[in-house]
């Protein structure tokens, strides 16, 4: 449990300082939404966690998209869906979050090209809709 807490604290610090580099970020709201997502995840309220992580992403939290991607890879609270996982990792990678980039590239090795293209299209739509259309 302590190791998990340390990892979460490290991710929070990395995303906080990474978010500062992007300017148009509401760090306080992003971190609050992300923390609520972590609480929901800890309580196994996975759909609520996704909603909070999406809100955190909309406020500029760099790590939140990776957490959503992990839920889709593992099928926690949602059906396993590598296309949606790739979409969320792509969103994080586009913002400069290294974990998202690494995870996106990892799952791409087991995806077909059509699914990857669809995921990229979905990521673009999600970002352009300000995270309202992310399915």
Regions found by a protein language model. Give the residues of each.
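Hydrophobic face of amphipathic alpha-helices that form TPR/SEL1-like repeat modules
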Residues: 31-42, 65-74, 105-108
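Bacterial N-terminal signal peptides
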Residues: 9-19
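Terminal, low-structured helical/coil segments at or just beyond the last alpha-helical repeat
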Residues: 26, 30, 101-135
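Short coil/turn and helix-start
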Residues: 24-26, 42-46, 58-59, 72-80, ...
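TPR/TPR-like alpha-solenoid repeats
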Residues: 56, 71, 92, 107-110, ...
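TPR alpha-solenoid repeat register
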Residues: 64-66, 78, 100-102
């Amino acid at each position: 449990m302590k190791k998990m807490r340390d990892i979460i604290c490290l991710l929070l610090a990395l995303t906080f300082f990474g978010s500062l580099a992007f300017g148009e970020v509401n760090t306080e709201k992003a971190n609050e939404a992300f923390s609520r997502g972590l609480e929901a995840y800890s309580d196994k309220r996975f759909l609520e966690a996704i909603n909070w992580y999406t809100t955190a992403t909309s406020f500029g939290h760099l790590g939140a998209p990776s957490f959503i991607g992990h839920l889709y890879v593992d099928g926690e609270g949602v059906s396993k869906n590598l296309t949606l996982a790739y979409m969320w990792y792509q969103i994080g990678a586009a913002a400069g979050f290294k974990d998202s980039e690494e995870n996106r590239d990892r799952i791409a090795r087991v995806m077909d090209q059509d699914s990857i293209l669809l995921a990229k299209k979905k990521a673009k739509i999600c970002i352009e809709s300000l995270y309202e259309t992310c399915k």
